[in-house]
Amino acid sequence: MSPHYIGTMADAADHDAGQDVRLRARVEGVVQAVGFRYWTVRKAEELSLTGTVRNEDDGTVAVVVEGPQSVVLEFRRWLGSDDAPGRVDHVEESVSPATGEFSSFDVVY
């Protein structure tokens, strides 16, 4: 684990809300073939976040998103809400400092 690992979004609340963070999320449920990636891109772009979203072979969706901690928290809440397409049963997450690796938010195939 990186020495800069923060934990979950709940743990990140103890940090500066303006600090840029990276959220890695694995979304479980009925999240493939329901437009989940498309809506995830739209939500990330609406919030001016960067990162990627991709379908995994096990039926989950992997999301990596970077931006200000308070905005990433809003995005994380959306990921697990009824507003997200399909049916989200569980979101596994980890948070670390942002790397600045991304310049946009894209679907990875």
From Swiss-Prot:
Domain Acylphosphatase-like residue range list: 22-109
Keyword Hydrolase found: yes
EC number: 3.6.1.7
Coiled-coil stretches: none
EC main group: hydrolase
GO terms, molecular function: acylphosphatase activity
Catalysed reaction, written as an equation: an acyl phosphate + H2O = a carboxylate + phosphate + H(+)
UniProt keywords, alphabetically: Hydrolase
Positions of the catalytic residues: 37, 55
Homology family: Belongs to the acylphosphatase family.
Record-given protein name: Acylphosphatase
Organism, as annotated: Arthrobacter sp. (strain FB24)
Taxonomic classification: Bacteria, Bacillati, Actinomycetota, Actinomycetes, Micrococcales
